[in-house]
Amino acid sequence: DSVYGLCRDETSIAAKVQDKTGLKCYNGGLGGTVLGRADAERRLGYTKDSVSAAGLVRSFVVKDFGVQKTVRVREPATDYFEDTLGDLGQIDFDQVKILFIGSGLNDYHAGNPIESTENPYDEYTYCGAIRSIVRELRDAYPDLRIIFITPPYTWYTVPELTCEEYDLGGGVLEDYVNAEIGLCQALDVEVIDIYHDFYPHDTWEDL
């Protein structure tokens, strides 16, 4: 998400975590991307889905980011993508101890389904992508500590609604958040809830 991707200096979350823990941290955040796959036609060869969390994890597992390097995104806010993807391709994932996955706001914006009634590992759904991510990472890196971070509470000025009111097709944002929290608990995976617990959001003045 851009919450992480657009802040890459000493004030970034990765930099703060590195300062506090002494661990070497890398910010692999890519703004505007989704956790699950989003192509409406479900084309596995759709290259933009390779920068989703599900697509990136597949590359972590096979240790090959070649597909991501073919993605061409023209928006100026994504000018750091090329360098970030190049850096990810140089990381020795066998040495990675902790992986934070903070995503989901764009799944909500896209109206992606939360769950599939047919395939629990359907990566075109929010929960299916989480299950697939956890399964693949645990199979490839059994000692890796996986920590999900929920989307934050969000206001919209056009229309003037909060995420509690704004349904973009898949439900309100809290539906995604609660599904993520419940699923992570069921999978015995850590999750940090920044939707409910991070900052006050009772009134518009809190914005």
Go through the PLM ranges and name each one.
Residues R8-S12, P120-G128, D167-E174:
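Soluble non-cytosolic domains of exported or imported proteins
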Residues A40-G45, P151-L207:
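Catalytic His-Asp segment of secreted/periplasmic serine-dependent ester chemistry enzymes
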Residues F100-N112, V134-L173:
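Active-site segments of SGNH/GDSL-like serine hydrolases
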Residues D1-S50:
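Serine-esterase "nucleophile elbow" of acetyl-processing enzymes
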Residues K24-G29, K97-G102, R145-T150, E190-D193:
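Structural recognition of the beta-strand scaffold that forms the well-ordered cores
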Residues S2-G5, L30-L35, L105-A110, P152-Y156, ...:
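Solvent-exposed loop/turn segments at secondary-structure junctions
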Residues I130-V134, V177:
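Generic structural signal for well-ordered alpha-helices
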Residues T47-Y124:
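Oxyanion-hole/transition-state-stabilizing segment in secreted/luminal serine hydrolases
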